[in-house]
Amino acid sequence: WQDGGSCYLTKFDSHEIVRGQQGDPWMGQVAWPDYPDTLSRRKNTQSWRHDWVNRQFITTETAMPQCKTFTSGLDFIERNHNEDLWFLQIEAFDPHEPFYTQNEYKKLYPDNYHGKNLDWPDYGKNEYGEAATRHVRYEYASLMSMCDHYLGKVLDMMDKYDLWKDTMLIVNTDHGFMLGEKEWMGKNVQPMYEELIHIPFFIYDPRNPIQGERRNQLAQTIDIVPTLAEFFQIAPPEYMDGHSLTPVIRNDTPIRDYALFGIFGGHICITDGRYVYMRSCKDPENQPLYEYTAMPCHMDRPFSQEEMSEAELCDKNAFNFMKQSGVFKVPVHHSTDSYRFYTMLFDLLTDPEQKCPIHDSNIEDHLCQAMKKMMKDNQAPKEQFERIGLTE
């Protein structure tokens, strides 16, 4: 419900919001809250302040936003399991940082750490040392175990009402988090390594009731909606780039040769499943770069007056998925710095931890051609090619 999420929840027939997660400005308190000495550099930020205000009211498991969210979702299933044609999204937010949970889960990972508080690590090179790094991993594991517990309640309810006979179940997440791997902590500031982008994904399809098997094909988050549309017998929009996962589920049939991924203003990346190619900007200025939007909001605030003063209205035919609706084109002067990492190529077969970039002009040329095609297929603006030094 932050500015950047405007109108998302209201597109559902019903929605429920659970407050108090992370730096949510939930409980009103003028005075700064008490908090322990910490290793985090966030301690003077408003999100840090709100988080520690909220923790004063989240002291038991049943008060945890995750518990309340899953409980609400389970209540929906309890009341609606006999109905047809329903869609439920349980968005737990966890195991997102801060990795705050209760002792019942912390005791699963005995920790002799006696240092300063560290359950909301800073993003950047890992400078915490061995003991603190191990501690934050245990904090993460504790929260992950809580997620496992509540996901188990969903599976139990699937069993209770035999929903497996006609209900699709999808378990996925948006991104990973680095906990000291390759000497990095956090996300967004480093290259898009496997720990960040190769995310867990589980799906059960009652039309193909296969259990306990893995698949080896490339898939992306954009493939979820076409899969759901097919399941509910809805024709997906013509401009949708994802593919139904049904062939993969049924017999491991591939649905794509490559996956294109990255972060705004950072590396543009492509993989064929073995090789990962990360293309950086061509120079430190990282230009030209624009944001395109019909709703000028960042995640937690509207675009500033200064930003909008530079905005121009884009050609209505620039993107066919906008159906000839105009969008703002806004210059961006600050973004993720990919130039300092340069362009990199990894072979996941011989180097799954991505510790040693390789140099192979034939593979790079091949992936460059595939990248250009996918960027065109995705209607990437022309300046994106210029930014990373590719000709269209």
Task: Enumerate the predicted regions with their spans.
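Catalytic-site neighborhoods of secreted/periplasmic enzymes
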Residues: W1-T59
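Short catalytic/ligand-binding loop motif for oxyanion handling, primarily in non-cytosolic enzymes
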Residues: W1-G4, G23-W26, D84-L85, D94-T101, ...
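Active-site His/acidic residue clusters
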Residues: G73-V136, M178, K355
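A long, amphipathic alpha-helix that forms part
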Residues: M64-H81, W120-L169, F231, M374
